[in-house]
Each structure stands twice: as structure tokens, then as C-alpha cells.
Amino acid sequence: MTKKIVLQIAYQGTSYSGWQYQPNALSIQEVLETILKKIAGFRISVISSGRTDAGVHAQGQIAHFHCPDHPHFTDPRQIQKMLNALLPHDIVIHDAVMTDGDFHSRFSAIAKEYRYTLSLLPKPLPHHRLFCFSPRYKLNIARMQEAAQYLVGTHDFASFANLGREYSSTIRTLYTLDLSEQEHLVTVICRGNGFLYKMVRNIVGALLDIGKGKYPPEHLLDMLATKDRRKGPPSAPPYGLSLHHVCYPPPYQWFCKHEHNNSSEGK
């Protein structure tokens, strides 16, 4: 069986068109594949757990590639060192492992965690400005937290899925949707078995409407019931969002920070 190298990747998405290769813009995937080609002498395709959008960051993106028959690709630690030596400053390989199983970065995943950071300051601090969104109006965090709980569980999230994409199903399960406040920053922690296109940013956009008093917390129940994205609020900007963690079942828990209580979590 062909061996695979699995990478845990962090990146600042500010300068990129997203994860996926784009013909007229620079992507994270293109940068990685270009460097792997430089090392191996031929093209190597890198497959990720999911496609982050333009401007979205990652702390724990997972990607894999089939290990070529090449002397530079026998030791995952050496591969990590070589990649980090050649990658730009805004992409880092946190870890690398080798597997000979049926692991697939996307299809083996059982849960993902995204985090969206909000600044409560009118103007974010310089070292935060690329990683958080400042709505510049007062937010009632308690009401946002109350509203968030209406979305926890298994629901049809059609109202939170951007138009223009075809989905085999818009039903997803959120295990956690919490707000954590620390000084002038609020982090929206969203963990689920899978996410629709721009789903997290659309959820944050809806929570912002609740937080500024436009709607009561129960409005999110109405949004779920309508199943119509056109009646929803604008998406929150991409630069506040980060793919924080991807979780896999045994024996693929190389990078897992915590176990999930529900052993039946889906992909």
C-alpha cells in the first residue's frame, strides 16, 4: 500500500486566494505543491481536509500527499524541516507523520473546529488587525450566547449556506457553538461534523445582528425554519475566521487535542 505523508499546517490567509488552486491567484495549495515539486523534481498533489476561503486563516489545517519513491521522502520530520525552510513566513508545517493506512484528510475527518475572533475595540490593536473583525458597535454578548444555543444540534442549515453551490444535503450537526470573552476580544467557537460553504461566517453574521439588538435570540429559530439564505444577514468578513482543529478517529489521532464524547460523529 502506498505510504502517505500527513501534514498539520498553519497559515495566515491574508495574502492568498484560499486553500484551493486558482488559475489567476496565489493559493496555499499552489505554494505547497510548488515547493514539493522543487524537492522531488516532479508534481505532487496535496489534498486538504477542506478548502478555506480567501483571507481565512488556519491553525490546524490537515493535508496529505502520496509519498513518492524518493530519498528525501523517507522521514516525515525531515520533510517538515525541508518544507519549513522553503515556505514563506506566513505558512508553517506544525507537524508531519507517515501512514500506510486508508487515511484521507477530508473523508476521514469526523469533526472540525472553526474560531471567529471579534474585537470589541473601535479599532483593533495592530497585532490583532489581520486576525479579527471589529464591528464598531456595542454587542450584547450574553444575548449572542443565548442565541447560539438554538443552533447546537442537528439541523437543516440551508439558511446559513451561501447560494450558488449544490449540496447533497444541508443537514449538519453542531456539537458546540460558544462565545468566549477575554478582555477586548470575543471568540466564537464552532465545532461540528461538517460545514456548508461560508456557514460559519453566516452564523457569525446572524449572531452580530442579535448582539446589536436588531433581533431577539429566538430569531435564529426563524432563520432555521425559513431555509432561505436570501433572508439572512451578510456574512462576517473572512479575516476573523480560522480553521482551528480537525479531528479524526483512531488510529488517525496524531494531532488531536481532545477526544469527542460522541463516538458516532459523522464526516
Curated annotation (Swiss-Prot):
Example GO biological process: tRNA pseudouridine synthesis
InterPro entries: PsdUridine_synth_cat_dom_sf, PsdUridine_synth_TruA, PsdUridine_synth_TruA_a/b_dom, PsdUridine_synth_TruA_C, TruA/RsuA/RluB/E/F_N
Residues forming the catalytic site: 53 (nucleophile)
Reactions accelerated catalytically: uridine(38/39/40) in tRNA = pseudouridine(38/39/40) in tRNA
SUPFAM superfamilies: Pseudouridine synthase
E.C. number: 5.4.99.12
Name of one Pfam family that matches: PseudoU_synth_1
Keywords: Isomerase, tRNA processing
Enzyme class: isomerase
Cystine connections: none
Role this protein plays: Formation of pseudouridine at positions 38, 39 and 40 in the anticodon stem and loop of transfer RNAs.
Subunit record text: Homodimer.
PANTHER family: PSEUDOURIDYLATE SYNTHASE (PTHR11142), TRNA PSEUDOURIDINE SYNTHASE-LIKE 1 (PTHR11142:SF0)
Protein name: tRNA pseudouridine synthase A
